[in-house]
């Protein structure tokens, strides 16, 4: 009489607590996950790269806009001097920050960001000029720029030609146009703004205490 065959379960396929899948089975899901992760990764966009570049290029502007301690390192006399000229305002780092905050409220912060980028560019070492000039041009001057500045066609075209053989002065023409625009348009409004007047009044009140 033939003994009945006993069917034994395949342990490596059981979902039990003590046995895991075979090495071959355990490796396959990991490859699948890796493939899924690769598919989910998206290439960095130029816009994101440019934002990172702008933050690294003028970090004090962004940090200053968010700072709540400006009153601790400013005097009323210093802030009053900002009303003498745009030049005096921009010569002061905290002045740049406060003016930048005002421009941001008017959605025109690209003007001071470009001006600061040009100031930084002039201090650039010769072997780095080409790379930095290209970044500034693409960020502010190009017709599809992330933060396109308001300059005339001639200045835009002239700047485009100059960056092909970059020098420390290749953005000077465009920078002067933006400076004149801020001086004539934004700066007078800034001096009448709550951002400036409240800061000045608070500092003057603290002086009298």
Curated annotation (Swiss-Prot):
Gene Ontology process terms (BP): G protein-coupled receptor signaling pathway; leukotriene signaling pathway; negative regulation of signal transduction; positive regulation of GTPase activity; response to bacterium; signal transduction
Compositionally biased tracts (Basic and acidic residues): 24-38
Tissue expr: Expressed in multiple tissues.
Gene Ontology cellular-component terms listed: cytoplasmic side of plasma membrane; cytosol
Location of the RGS domain: 85-200
Transmembrane segments: none
Superkingdom of the organism of origin: Eukaryota
Keywords on record: Cell membrane, Cytoplasm, GTPase activation, Membrane, Signal transduction inhibitor
Annotated GO MF terms: G-protein alpha-subunit binding; GTPase activator activity
Membrane topology: Peripheral membrane protein
Main function: Regulates G protein-coupled receptor signaling cascades, including signaling downstream of the N-formylpeptide chemoattractant receptors and leukotriene receptors. Inhibits B cell chemotaxis toward CXCL12. Inhibits signal transduction by increasing the GTPase activity of G protein alpha subunits, thereby driving them into their inactive GDP-bound form.
Name the UniProt record assigns to this protein: Regulator of G-protein signaling 1
Species assigned in the record: Rattus norvegicus (Rat)
Lineage: Eukaryota, Metazoa, Chordata, Craniata, Vertebrata
């Amino acid at each position: 009489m033939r003994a009945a065959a006993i069917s034994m379960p395949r342990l490596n396929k059981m979902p039990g607590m003590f046995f895991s899948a075979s090495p071959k089975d355990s490796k396959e899901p990991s490859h699948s996950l890796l493939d899924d992760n690769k598919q989910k990764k998206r290439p960095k966009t130029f816009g994101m790269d440019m934002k990172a570049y702008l933050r690294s290029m003028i970090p004090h502007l962004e940090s200053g806009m968010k700072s709540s301690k400006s009153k601790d390192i400013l005097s009323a006399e210093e802030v009053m001097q900002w009303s003498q000229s745009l030049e005096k305002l921009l010569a002061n780092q905290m002045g740049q920050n406060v003016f930048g905050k005002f421009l941001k409220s008017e959605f025109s912060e690209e003007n001071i960001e470009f001006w600061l980028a040009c100031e930084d560019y002039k201090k650039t070492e010769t072997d780095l000029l080409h790379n930095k000039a290209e970044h500034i041009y693409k960020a502010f001057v190009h017709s599809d720029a992330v933060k396109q500045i308001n300059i005339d066609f001639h200045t835009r075209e002239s700047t485009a030609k100059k960056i092909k053989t970059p020098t420390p002065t290749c953005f000077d023409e465009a920078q002067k146009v933006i400076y004149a625009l801020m001086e004539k348009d934004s700066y007078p409004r800034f001096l009448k703004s709550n951002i400036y007047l409240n800061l000045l009044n608070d500092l003057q009140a603290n002086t009298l205490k």
